[in-house]
Curated annotation (Swiss-Prot):
Main localization category: cytoplasm
Functional description taken from the UniProt entry: Catalyzes the NADPH-dependent reduction of N-acetyl-5-glutamyl phosphate to yield N-acetyl-L-glutamate 5-semialdehyde.
CDD domains: AGPR_1_C, AGPR_1_N
Cross-referenced Pfam families: Semialdhyde_dh, Semialdhyde_dhC_1
Subcellular location: Cytoplasm
The species this protein was found in: Idiomarina loihiensis (strain ATCC BAA-735 / DSM 15497 / L2-TR)
Cited InterPro entries: AGPR_AS, AGPR_type-1, NAD(P)-bd_dom_sf, NAGSA_dehydrogenase, Semialdehyde_DH_NAD-bd
Highest taxon in the source lineage: Bacteria
Reactions this protein catalyses: N-acetyl-L-glutamate 5-semialdehyde + phosphate + NADP(+) = N-acetyl-L-glutamyl 5-phosphate + NADPH + H(+)
NCBIfam families registered for this protein in UniProt: argC
Family the entry assigns: Belongs to the NAGSA dehydrogenase family. Type 1 subfamily.
GO cellular component terms given for this protein: cytoplasm
Gene: argC
GO molecular function: N-acetyl-gamma-glutamyl-phosphate reductase activity; NAD binding; NADP+ binding
Protein name: N-acetyl-gamma-glutamyl-phosphate reductase
Amino acid sequence: MQYTAAQSQSVAIIGASGYVGVELTRLVQQHPALSLLGCYVSEHSSDAGSLLSDLHPQYAHLVKLSLQGLSSQKKELIKSSADTVFLCTDHGVSVELAPEFLAAGLKVIDLSGGFRLNATEDYPSFYGFEHQQDSWLQQAVYGLAEWYPQEIAAAQLVAVPGCYPTAALMALLPVKQAGLLSCNKIIINAVSGVTGAGRKAALTSHGAELSLQAYGLFEHRHTPEIAQQLQHEVLFTPHLAQFPRGILATVYAELNDDVSDADLDKAYQCYADQPLVRFEKQARPAIKNVVQQPFVDIGWHRQGNQLIAFSAIDNLLKGAASQAIQCVNLQLGLALEEGLL
């Protein structure tokens, strides 16, 4: 399909060497309405000058690009030549870089947590830095594509949701929006593949050390993100497992009295026309069915007033890169699934 100039975008990817960055690069390269200006890493990164395919040889047939150090000259090139910048950088780095590109009139799709929370005072405790960009924080739109399409379409700055929040919110928002949840705390347990820990070597994600373990008890940075979007108290426990990629979230919620299966069916019908949501009432989603796919698979079971809902996603795709593409599609007036199926 041919696209008009208004529907075609030149994009730059900063932080392209990581797991999310290379997935995003692959998706941009395959997207009919996007042209890739360049892939960038920190100016002093050891990856600068490397071929992306050297770091990720499984994509050698798709991605034959050099990783460029983000010098001041490269920043000026991006400002003058790109329409949209994807930030696959550390949270604090995104907060530093985004305002510079936004001030130049570019759109920014931030895949870090730098603009996900509403309040700057939450950042020292959950992200470890003082957030100095309150104005942009208030303007950022949360990029959960199926739920905020109009807001995303009009936004200059989009904060792509975290991987765990994406899985949890996709399972819970239909029930919350329908007013079916009691006021009691929601419990969320989620298991992620090891790519969720990033590319940098760490003992906790070393193959010989890893099995299945909970982490971030009571203090994981995705807890306030989930609670903020649900406007509901949650108890979230993430787990890291010894498989490469994917997330399975299991959520436990108490329903209001007299909520029926029919009420739940009606609530989840909000996904009936969503091309990247696969929903089945009695399904028990499995990670193997979503790995390397842009879908979210959802299922639920009810007993009395207790709801157990499941959600499975690929943490690198629906949990990051493909959701970012969905956001760009909305901004270009394209179908959500454009370039993804």
